[in-house]
């Protein structure tokens, strides 16, 4: 008998029911609602650009991860090595080259192969022996998107579950509603041959009655709701939890309340509980958070693909104001339609204004911003990948991890800045890194208002590169950038 994985509010698993569930569970006005993957606020409350930047920055962290999960069809074949730091350096270091070496149950092996995994990814080679060890070992792991880390911790949970015990045994915390559902989808696919194992979603709106008895062995949810289920509703007996997973830690710490709720849930776990934490990045703040969650961990890092500027010609055009930048972009438009192009804006407000103005003036463009539901964003990116859209106006949601080979020019309508107004060097690198992919020549043009010219010098110094001045009003000069 196949396992039952559908939550009570999503019995049929249809997209329509999921969207209906989201639409009928609106939070109070003015609150940031990341359990539903969206920002809901009283109309007009966040009218200034600075607040728009802050909100967009936080939301992009979560949606970037979800978009990559929706868009990737295969694992990333990274050429970089895995760095392993063991809790006990004297212990032998094991890695595996096949799933058979892990001595998994046959039904789990069938599920893995049915998902299309033929061999472990680089992070799985090293992480799985640690995650499946007896006695269990704690783990902190860093990896880029698409390296198979979700499948790795799902395999660990399914391996630890006792199907004969009808109560929660594993908890997985995700920062948003949609990311939790994506993790549940992996559980469903990998565990479809495992009889008697169920999963339930601890998400806002899915509220079993007080005193209800949960029979699902795996609980996937957002921190606040899981905390309520553990202590307010007493649906979960924390002493029975054998595996605690915290996914997307770098997103979690940027969402107000999530980090504190996560720590409170973790502190209630028994000492024997295995702690697994995953993050795409590990700035100091993430490390500090990880250390509060995971005691005595093994640590695994998979180095990110290094972006290079060597194939990218960088230009800038100095403009008086937004309207002059728009005129410069229109002059560029005759050049950028030669191939596919991405135009980056700092805020959703500017992106919406720009795409509408371009459309009104007869230019064919597509808009990708945080105002679109995330599944619509995935569809838009897929259309762009397939060449059905030639020019994409977007915010930073498209700055990382979206590889489109045909993109030959990137335009920064606004330079990327941090919340404090300083240059966001990493986002600049990732933005212009959308062109010049796979060894091809790429072009990046930044449209700079007079007040922000000093930022160009900072970018040049930071990357030890040269950004050439361009006069977008000189069409002869414009044509030369392709030669």
Swiss-Prot record:
Its EC number is 3.6.4.13. Pfam families: DEAD, Helicase_C. It catalyses: ATP + H2O = ADP + phosphate + H(+). Disulfide bonds: none annotated. GO terms for cellular component: chromatoid body; cytoplasmic stress granule; mitochondrial cloud; nucleus; pole plasm. It is an enzyme of class 3 (hydrolase). A motif (Q motif) lies at residues 97-125. The keyword Cell cycle does not apply. A motif (DEAD box) lies at residues 247-250. Keywords: ATP-binding, Cytoplasm, Helicase, Hydrolase, Nucleotide-binding, Nucleus, RNA-binding. SUPFAM superfamilies: P-loop containing nucleoside triphosphate hydrolases. CDD domains: DEADc_DDX25, SF2_C_DEAD. Residues 311-478 form the Helicase C-terminal domain. An mRNA component of germ plasm. Localizes to the granulo-fibrillar material (GFM) of the mitochondrial cloud in stage I oocytes. Associated, at a low level, with the periphery of mature germinal granules in later stage oocytes. Localizes to the vegetal cortex in stage II oocytes and segregates with germ plasm during early embryogenesis. In adults, expression is restricted to the ovary and, at a lower level, to spermatogonia, spermatocytes and spermatids of the testis. This is ATP-dependent RNA helicase DDX25.
């Amino acid at each position: 008998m196949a396992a039952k994985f559908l939550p009570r509010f999503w019995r049929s698993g249809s997209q329509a029911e999921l969207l209906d569930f989201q639409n009928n569970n609106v939070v109070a006005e003015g609150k940031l609602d990341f359990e539903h993957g969206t920002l809901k606020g009283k109309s007009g409350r966040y009218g200034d650009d600075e607040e728009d930047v802050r909100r967009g920055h936080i939301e992009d962290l979560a949606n970037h991860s979800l978009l990559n999960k929706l868009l990737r069809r295969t694992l990333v074949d990274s050429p970089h090595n895995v760095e392993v730091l063991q809790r006990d350096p004297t212990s032998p270091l094991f890695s595996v080259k096949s799933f058979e070496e892990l001595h998994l149950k046959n039904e789990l092996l069938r599920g893995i192969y049915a998902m299309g995994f033929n061999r472990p990814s680089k992070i799985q080679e090293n992480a799985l022996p640690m995650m499946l060890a007896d006695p269990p070992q704690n783990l902190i792991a860093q990896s880029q998107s698409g390296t198979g880390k979700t499948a790795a911790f799902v395999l660990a949970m399914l391996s630890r579950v006792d199907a004969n015990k009808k109560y929660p045994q594993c908890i997985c915390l995700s920062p948003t509603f949609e990311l939790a559902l994506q993790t549940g989808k992996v559980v469903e696919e990998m565990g479809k041959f495992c009889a008697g194992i169920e999963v339930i979603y601890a998400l806002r709106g899915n509220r079993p009655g007080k005193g209800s008895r949960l029979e699902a062995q795996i609980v996937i949810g957002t921190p606040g709701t899981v905390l309520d289920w553990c202590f307010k509703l007493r649906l979960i007996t924390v002493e029975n939890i054998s595996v605690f997973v915290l996914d997307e830690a770098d997103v979690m710490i940027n969402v107000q309340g999530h980090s504190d709720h996560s720590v409170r849930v973790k502190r209630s776990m028994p000492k024997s509980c295995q702690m697994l934490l995953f993050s795409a990045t590990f700035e100091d703040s993430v490390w500090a958070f990880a250390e509060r969650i995971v005691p005595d961990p093994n640590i695994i890092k998979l180095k990110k693909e290094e972006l290079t500027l060597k194939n990218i010609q960088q230009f800038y055009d100095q403009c008086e104001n937004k309207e002059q930048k728009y005129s410069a972009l229109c002059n560029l438009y005759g050049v950028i339609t030669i191939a596919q192009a991405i135009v980056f804006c700092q805020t959703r407000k500017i992106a919406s204004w720009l795409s509408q103005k371009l459309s009104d003036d007869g230019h064919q463009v597509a808009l990708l911003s945080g105002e679109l539901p995330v599944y619509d964003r995935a569809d838009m990116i897929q259309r762009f990948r397939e060449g059905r859209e030639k020019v994409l106006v977007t915010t930073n949601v498209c700055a990382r991890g979206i590889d489109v080979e045909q993109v030959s020019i990137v335009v920064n309508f606004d330079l990327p800045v941090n919340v404090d107004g300083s240059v966001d060097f990493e986002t600049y690198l990732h933005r212009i890194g959308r062109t010049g992919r796979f060894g091809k020549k790429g072009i990046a043009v930044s449209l700079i208002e007079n007040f922000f010219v000093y930022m160009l010098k900072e970018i040049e110094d930071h990357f030890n590169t040269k950004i050439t001045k361009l006069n977008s009003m000189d069409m002869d000069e414009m044509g030369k950038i392709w030669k």
